UniProtKB/Swiss-Prot annotation:
EC number: 2.1.2.1
Pathway: One-carbon metabolism; tetrahydrofolate interconversion; Amino-acid biosynthesis; glycine biosynthesis; glycine from L-serine: step 1/1
Species this chain originates from: Aster yellows witches'-broom phytoplasma (strain AYWB)
Chief localisation class: cytoplasm
Molecular-function GO terms, alphabetical: glycine hydroxymethyltransferase activity; pyridoxal phosphate binding
UniProt subunit comment: Homodimer.
Positions of the record's site feature: Plays an important role in substrate specificity: H242
Cellular-component GO terms for this entry: cytosol
Annotated localization: Cytoplasm
Known function: Catalyzes the reversible interconversion of serine and glycine with tetrahydrofolate (THF) serving as the one-carbon carrier. This reaction serves as the major source of one-carbon groups required for the biosynthesis of purines, thymidylate, methionine, and other important biomolecules. Also exhibits THF-independent aldolase activity toward beta-hydroxyamino acids, producing glycine and aldehydes, via a retro-aldol mechanism.
Catalytic activity: (6R)-5,10-methylene-5,6,7,8-tetrahydrofolate + glycine + H2O = (6S)-5,6,7,8-tetrahydrofolate + L-serine
Lineage: Bacteria, Bacillati, Mycoplasmatota, Mollicutes, Acholeplasmatales
Protein family per UniProt: Belongs to the SHMT family.
Stated name of the protein: Serine hydroxymethyltransferase
Reported cofactor(s): pyridoxal 5'-phosphate
Length: 429
């Protein structure tokens, strides 16, 4: 090769200083479109919320560059001085917020938090007992398509057919018959207060672990607006971060029992995860700090007030609310009670056309398939964060009712959409 011939670069150097817009216009544009969608829609999905800029800053930080397999002061990698401190702060804040002795902040999601606990406390084939998915349970509480129904022998309790509320005498009967090793209390679509003390009594009677999954109500529990599972001596509490707790997407495990905590830590790492997402753990720490502020409790109080007012507004228009009322941040509407031709999917799809976003949801003893459903689920956390108050939710109920009564009238729906945008404009200044 001649001396002056330059070797052709096979892999052009990437300019790491470029911002997203300059580096990847396609993804940048889609994020901008999503940003606009979130501003231009009334978001009523109960499992969604808007995080603070501080949480976004932490989650989008350079901490994403660091690998930190293991736990603070027990890592398999060097260079973990700073991330050890961050994880310890997150743990300290989590335990203080929920009144627990021990916390694992590494689960990537609520599902993995549950999986880690099951891995720690159960053997394949052990019996578990949770609420039926159709009645408001969760996939990870024993559904056959989940690890919880695949690795373990899952059994279910139901809500009372008349009240659509938990029937603790019936749950006790099921537990005595099944003799589960683990009982799960906590739900994805249940609007009433959970009596953890009664669950503790049932669990003790059959010598079962009591696991409280507070993913949906964590923000309420943290503020004392819903009974805390630890007041009932729950063995383990699991949660997500991103619903009423208003944090980043991720999971959390809490316990007061040292031996269980050691097992749970092993269940998460090396049981089901490798390196934790330190940038997300930092964002969790920020969210825990925010949740300890007085303003956060006022926010949670407003979430409950808004949900209660919202549900009553629908009842006054002839809609049936599952279980009759709500004690928390969400409620279910039985749309078939309004019109037997309606389905949850049909109503949810129509509402999205007018910039109101809900999700289709099964209701207790639903005869429709899960992708069709007889109900819709509605939550108030996200729009309460935006600034909605009771009168705003009454206005939304009125708009939704008008749209539902003109389901197939595209011209009328277009007019309703403009009213939705006008309502939102007050909060987007």
């Amino acid at each position: 090769m001649p001396k002056n011939t330059k070797r052709k670069r096979l892999c052009p150097k990437m300019n790491q200083k470029l911002g997203l817009k300059d580096q990847d216009q396609e993804i940048f544009d889609l994020i901008e479109q999503e940003k606009a969608r979130q501003k231009e829609n009334i978001l009523l999905i109960a499992s969604e919320n808007f995080v603070s800029q501080a949480v976004l800053d932490a989650q989008g930080s350079i901490l994403t560059n660091k690998y930190a397999e293991g736990y603070p002061q027990a890592r398999y990698y060097n260079g973990c001085k700073n991330v050890d401190q961050i994880e310890k702060i997150a743990i300290q804040r989590a335990t203080k917020l929920f009144g627990a002795k021990y916390a694992n902040v590494q689960p990537h999601s609520g599902s993995q938090a549950n999986m880690g606990v099951f891995q720690a406390l159960l053997k394949p084939g052990d019996k578990i007992l949770g609420l039926s998915l159709m009645d408001g349970g969760h996939l990870t509480h024993g559904h056959k398509l989940s690890f919880s129904g695949g690795f373990y022998e899952a059994h279910f309790y139901n809500v009372n057919p008349q009240t659509e509320m938990l029937d603790y005498d019936e749950i006790r009967k099921v537990a005595l018959a099944v003799k589960p090793k683990l009982i799960i209390a906590g739900y994805s679509a249940y609007s009433k207060t959970i009596n953890f003390k009664k669950f503790r009594q049932i669990a003790d009677e059959v010598n079962a672990y009591l696991i409280a999954d507070i993913a949906h109500i964590a923000g309420l529990v943290a503020c004392g607006l819903h009974p805390c599972p630890f007041e009932a001596n729950a063995d383990v509490v699991t949660s997500t971060m991103h619903k009423t707790l208003r944090g980043p997407r991720g999971g959390l495990i809490l316990t007061n029992k040292e031996e269980l905590f050691k097992k749970i830590n092993r269940g998460i790492f090396p049981g089901i995860q490798g390196g934790p997402c330190i940038h997300t753990i930092a964002a969790k720490a920020v969210a825990f700090q925010e949740a300890m502020m007085p303003s956060f409790k006022e926010y949670q109080k407003q979430v409950i007030k808004n949900a209660n007012t919202f549900a009553k507004a629908f009842q006054q228009k002839g809609y049936r609310i599952v279980s009759g009322s709500t004690d928390n941040h969400l409620f279910l509407i039985d749309v078939k009670h309004k019109n037997t031709e309606f389905t949850g999917a049909k109503i949810a799809n129509m509402l999205e056309k007018i910039n109101i976003v809900v999700n289709k949801n099964t209701i207790p003893f639903d005869q429709e398939k899960p992708f069709v459903t007889s109900g819709i689920r509605i939550g108030t956390p996200a729009m309460t964060t935006v600034g909605f108050r009771e009168n705003d939710f009454v206005a939304v109920a009125d708009l939704m009712d008008k749209a539902i009564n003109h389901l197939d009238d595209e011209s009328y729906l277009s007019q309703i959409k403009q009213q939705v945008l006008a309502l939102l404009s007050k909060f987007n200044k």
